[in-house]
A protein has these predicted regions:
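ABC ATPase nucleotide-binding domain signature region
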Residues: 5-10, 14-68
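Conserved ABC ATPase "signature" region
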Residues: 64, 76-93
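Conserved ABC ATPase signature
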Residues: 97-101
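A short, proline-enriched helix->beta-strand linker immediately N-terminal to the Walker B motif
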Residues: 115-124
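Walker B catalytic motif
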Residues: 126-127, 131
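Helical segment within the ABC ATPase nucleotide-binding domain
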Residues: 136-149
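H-loop/switch region of ABC-family ATPase nucleotide-binding domains
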Residues: 157-158
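H-loop (His-switch) and adjacent beta-strand-loop-beta switch element
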Residues: 166, 170-178
Length: 178
């Protein structure tokens, strides 16, 4: 598999076909059984929005934690803080521990923090739709901008219409084999 700038690869296959495993290998979370993976540039992996979320920490502290997990410096995180906080729409709740948030509020925070990065290579396990209808519209626009700015997109999905909209290449996986 070789991808170059401008490539938009859609991964399709049944549950358990290897889509998420491939994304995790591309992200560096898994070592390949054979061969090697070489990636140039910053990888942003939107595989698990809840990764790194601490229910006992405040919303603000969770934004900082997610930023560090994404490889951002403290200065970069603080520079993005106002934008992320505003996007969440959570206002004073950001000073409260996440365990006091509803599931929708937690999803807003996790999505805003996870998508506040730049990506040379963007890995997505399904198209993300979080929150209520109004927030989903905002989230969709934000995701589109992230996808447009990414040099390379690898999107795992079950939805053929998404492949047609966003991908210029498709790889069908079955049992971990293309």
């Amino acid at each position: 598999l070789k991808l170059e700038a401008g490539d938009r690869l859609g991964l399709i296959g049944h549950n358990g076909s290897g889509k998420t495993t491939l994304l995790r290998a591309l992200s560096g979370a898994y070592e390949p059984d054979e061969g090697s993976i070489e990636v140039e540039g910053r990888i942003t992996a939107l595989l698990d929005l809840s990764l790194g979320i601490d229910p006992t920490a405040t919303g603000i502290d969770n934004i900082r934690l997610r930023g560090r997990i994404a490889g951002l410096s403290s200065r970069d995180i603080e520079a993005k803080m106002d934008e992320i906080a505003t996007f969440t729409g959570l206002g004073p709740f950001l000073a409260m521990p996440l365990k006091t948030y509803s599931a929708g509020m937690q999803a807003r925070l996790a999505f805003a923090a996870a998508t506040a990065v730049e990506a040379d290579v963007l890995l997505m396990d399904e198209w993300i739709a979080v929150g209520d209808a109004e927030f989903q519209k905002l989230a969709h626009k934000r995701l589109l901008k992230l996808v447009e700015r990414a040099g390379i997109l690898v999107l795992a999905t079950h939805e053929a219409p998404l492949l047609k909209l966003y991908c210029n290449k498709v790889m069908k996986l079955d049992g971990g084999v293309a």
